[in-house]
């Protein structure tokens, strides 16, 4: 069975940077982003401005769970791709062939117990709110076609609330908490040393 490493934390916490660091010590893995499992805005009965993307129900949780379960059993999946400009799932998918290690990252991957039970190593990135907001603002404007006003409005109305209601409480499930994300050199050194030892021992997380 494949080993799954889960990386969670608030939006803009530095999950991608930590994934990049892990890639230096685990040469072969597949990356699954929970973002690709957002539901299309067209699946909602109400207008886009009222859609809460910072709620667990914003994700296709059943498909996400089934795909992780299949990868853990070394079965390939057709991973969806989400279009953040048009806020809908693309028609095309990506064939993901499992490797001995699967890295999954997302803001709410530790919320559901059934998903947590599939993850062998749970890492939580704990980054200050102001830093996360600035990173999110820059990302959403440059990569997702958002305006400054829309990002601020979303943060004040749903993102901040969703973080404290759903995301931060999942720290209790983490095996490792990394303050400051990818900029915490000491924590990343500890993580890299741990992963090196696991690699030598055949990646047994038990």
Curated annotation (Swiss-Prot):
The keyword Transferase applies. It is an enzyme of class 2 (transferase). GO terms for biological process: CTP salvage; UMP salvage. It catalyses: uridine + ATP = UMP + ADP + H(+); cytidine + ATP = CMP + ADP + H(+). HAMAP family: Uridine_kinase (MF_00551). Pathway: Pyrimidine metabolism; CTP biosynthesis via salvage pathway; CTP from cytidine: step 1/3; Pyrimidine metabolism; UMP biosynthesis via salvage pathway; UMP from uridine: step 1/1. It comes from Borreliella burgdorferi (strain ATCC 35210 / DSM 4680 / CIP 102532 / B31). Keywords: ATP-binding, Cytoplasm, Kinase, Nucleotide-binding, Transferase. It is found in: Cytoplasm. This is Uridine kinase. Monomer. ATP binds at residues 9-16.
């Amino acid at each position: 069975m494949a080993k799954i490493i889960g990386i969670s934390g608030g939006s803009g916490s530095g999950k991608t940077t930590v994934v990049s660091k892990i890639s230096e010590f685990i040469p072969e893995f597949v990356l699954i982003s929970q973002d690709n499992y957002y539901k299309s805005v067209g699946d909602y009965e109400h207008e886009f401005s009222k859609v809460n993307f910072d709620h667990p129900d914003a994700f296709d949780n059943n498909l996400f769970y089934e795909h992780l379960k299949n990868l853990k059993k070394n079965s390939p999946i057709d991973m969806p791709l989400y279009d953040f400009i048009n806020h809908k799932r693309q028609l095309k998918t990506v064939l993901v062939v499992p490797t001995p290690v699967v890295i999954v990252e997302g803001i709410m991957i530790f919320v559901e117990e059934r998903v947590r039970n599939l993850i062998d190593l749970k890492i939580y990135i704990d980054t200050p709110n102001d830093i996360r907001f600035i990173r999110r603002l820059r990302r959403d404007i440059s990569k997702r076609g958002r305006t400054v006003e829309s990002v601020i409005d979303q943060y004040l109305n749903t993102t901040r609330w969703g973080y404290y209601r759903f995301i931060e409480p999942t720290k209790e499930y983490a095996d490792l908490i990394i303050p400051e994300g990818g900029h915490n050199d000491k924590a990343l050194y500890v993580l890299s040393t741990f992963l090196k030892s696991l690699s030598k021992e055949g990646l047994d997380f038990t």
